[in-house]
Amino acid sequence: MILRKKCISILLLTVLTASLCACGNTSKSISDSKDNKSSYSSTYNQNNEALKFDTAKWNYDETNNVYWTIGVQYCSDPESTDYETMAIYVPGEYMTGTKNSDGTYTCEINKSGEVNGYTSETAPIILPIDTPGYSAQAAPTSYNYDSAASYLKAGYVYVVAGMRGRSSLQGTSEDQGFSGGAPWGVTDLKAAVRYYRLNESLLPGDTDRFFSYGMSGGGAQSALMGATGDSELYYPYLESIGSAMTDADGNVISDAIAGSMDWCPVTSLDYANEAYEWNMGQYFTTDTRDSSSFKSALSKDMAASFAEYVNKLGLKSEDGTELTLSESEAGVYNNGTYYDYILNEIQTSLNNFLSDTTFPYTYTQGKIQIGNTASSGGGEGIDLSRNPGQGGNKDGQMPPQGQSGGRGQGAGMMQGGAQSSESKTYETAQDYIDSLNSDGTWIAYDSQTNTAKITSIEDFVKHCKEATKPVGAFDSVDLSRGENNLFGNGQSTALHFDSVESSLLSKNESNYSKYSDWDSSYITSFEDDLKSEDSVGTDMQTRVNMYNPMYYLSSYYSGYNTSKVAKYWRIRTGINQTDTALTVETNLKLALKNYDGVESVDFATVWGKPHTTAERTGNSTDNFISWVDECLK
């Protein structure tokens, strides 16, 4: 496979290295970043002519009063025009258009128009991210009003930016190969935001009011957009595709956003393996966790490593209690304030369900297929597969198994697809609780207060959140996980990235080698991959950091306070999902609530819901719009 490599200036990399060594809080508001000269210095020559928006290429949907345009190239040197263009959808009230001879329109901003209390100067700008399994989001090639209608009616500007996905793919001819994987997807989104800000005098919407949303891998990248604003780690990647870096006056252009909506974010991949084993894997002895496999021992060691990590994170609860784990007689580190906090999150989720639900209640069991997100909560959910970008591959679906090739098989990280559904109706809350307790009491229910208490995390997991992924849930020894593709680098389309797992394999070889399925080559495979660099010359650990929101939000990491973090956050997860540990979204919430400059964190886990756009009540589209309005009005 031939991949285009672009030269990155030595000066930029020198400045970048120096800046990363600096200490102190560099966080500023988004508006501040637009009004001040930047110390950004580089030999990069920005192609301003190529980055200027053409106001004469609008189209008009007279029926719905929408101005729209597609194929807007947001960088001057794209790796792939299949992905690195965007569509812009604007309520007609915000523009004044003059029809051209070819049927298109030349438009100017109309400052007097108003929709839902917003104007062309105050309207939020929405960025949908439909990237299940960190797959690509193809750029829109046609107009689709229905997918944007709710947002346009709310007075929002809707921007669908194509973005590369987790794999290094080959184009239709040999010279069209391009780099994918981390951090190229988020790089593309940042370039789209920067392009819009460069052209803000020509485009409607308040560029201080970018809000992203996504589910699963899209939720993860939405979280990254919220956490990595203006991170200098992305500069060489942005330059390599010809992104807008400075405006006409030499001011640095920000890629920070105002708000991030994240459903079931599969993120924090540096400790995702270990979190999965602590939260779920340690309680099971089937499949790869069978006692005959070395992975049963690895599972326990991973769980213990997660506890060590938690004890260094410095997480605090809402009342200021330091959250830590301690050893326990049963299980791996099933003690401490952190354990109690996670147990309380589970209990709160159940009690919210009891409070929200009117009985008789019908429960439908069955997992939603990723890429075709169905209803959540009490109504219809956001169907991310119907976004104008079409998500996933160009057909809007997950990449087929094995697409990426290489040493791994390219299996999707969230596969399983739709399962047959079974429905059951419960007449009362007591009937529902009795059903959950059918094989032993693990929930105590008080009908007078309509509240419940749960005995342990283990009981909850065994009944509602089974470990369906193998040991090495995100980085397996055979390189078969989707995340292994995410950290491929062009030369190898699947690579190991978990340094903790690598250390455990090396440190505990004498124990693991007692098992018949042990292979000493696992150690060298991990060690070699962790030394690899991508086409920009970035090492594996840095790439992992760039795709970890906690790297920017927690003082445990050197990236703390090196980015402009979004002010507004909303996180929802189906607590029954088996795709990732409950600790992932919980740690993200805790870090955000303790981060200076974050104004609000709206968080909930949704009882009985799987890996989907889960909501306690209502539907995800309306709830998202209501939340954005609450943040801004």
Task: Give the ranges of each region predicted by the language model.
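C-terminal motif of bacterial Sec signal peptides marking the signal peptidase cleavage site
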Residues: 19-22
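Histidine-bearing beta->alpha loop at or near hydrolase active sites
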Residues: 574-577, 600-622
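Primarily recognizes the serine-hydrolase "nucleophile elbow" in alpha/beta-hydrolase
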Residues: 198-283, 367, 374-388, 392, ...
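Short, surface-exposed "cap/lid" segments of acyl-processing enzymes
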Residues: 93-150, 570, 577-587
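Cap/lid segment of the alpha/beta-hydrolase catalytic domain
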Residues: 128-186, 228, 608-613, 619
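Disordered, low-complexity segments in secreted/periplasmic proteins that are enriched in proline
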Residues: 28-30, 34-38, 368-427, 487-488
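Alpha/beta-hydrolase active-site loop
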Residues: 178-202, 620-626
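Catalytic-loop region of hydrolases
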Residues: 30-122
